Amino acid sequence: KYETFDDPAKVMAYIRAEGKYPVVIKADGLALGKGVLICQNEQEAADGVKEIMLDKKFGASGNHVVVEEFLTGPEVSVLSFCDGKTVKPMVSSMDHKRALDHDEGLNTGGMGTVAPNPYYTPAVADRCMKEIFLPTVAAMQAEDCPFKGCLYFGLMLTPDGPKVIEYNCRFGDPETQVVLPLLESDLLTVMQATTNGTLDKTEVKFSDGAAACVILASGGYPLAYEKGKEITGLTEGQLDAADVTVYHAGTAIKEGKLVTN
């Protein structure tokens, strides 16, 4: 259940009328994965609405907000290749969003991921394909707006079954870092098939292995974080495991040193 608003007063009137907490408030636009607030009471909701809609923390993305009922259950990220008529899901993953250990702290763009998602069983995958993935692609076709590219399904496995939390028309970060290393098919071939509309004739195969991603973030993240701090321990000779890959974002080389940026 959800409602959208462009008036802060109407947001709070709706939340008070519903009277259910926690309640979820989302900036209806791009916010670097940080535009979702889970509010435990009316004061937190009021503070969140002010932050998003009045203080414009996320700029124009906060002109509208979505207020959603709070759902419980394991979260699942399923990236998929879609050529407008055929959808082929990639291996599932689980994103850990909280900044601190033990699922504590602020929501972030993601502090780590694992793939495959242990809660996403073959039975759940079949249900999602029938009830969510295929109907989504068919609906876009019916609106004469077929989608080609990476279609990202953000799901929650609730006691009432899988629910869609969000769609993204892009690869996920940090989900991609654990999903694509498990892809055994040639990525370029799959992407060409996605573009050409021939996914139904193209094999998309993933290994039976697993992958994990851990985010190393500068102090203060996801709020004001420290910049210019030296990062050590990431050179090839300093990494113990041969199968470790380091991906960079928000870093720079200054005076020959790797620093946060």
Walk through the language-model features, giving the residues of each:
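A conserved helix-loop-beta module that forms one wall/lid of the active-site cleft
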Residues: 1-35
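A short linear hydrophobic-aromatic micro-motif
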Residues: 22-25, 63-66, 200-202, 256
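Residue-level signal for inorganic ion chemistry
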Residues: 26, 109, 214
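Internal nucleotide-binding/catalytic subdomain
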Residues: 35-178
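Hydrophobic side chains in beta-strands
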Residues: 80, 157, 216-217, 248
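Active-site "cap" helix and flanking loop/linker of ATP-utilizing ligase/carboxylase catalytic domains
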Residues: 129-151, 168-241, 249-255
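Short, intrinsically disordered, charge-balanced linker/junction segments flanking boundaries
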Residues: 255-261
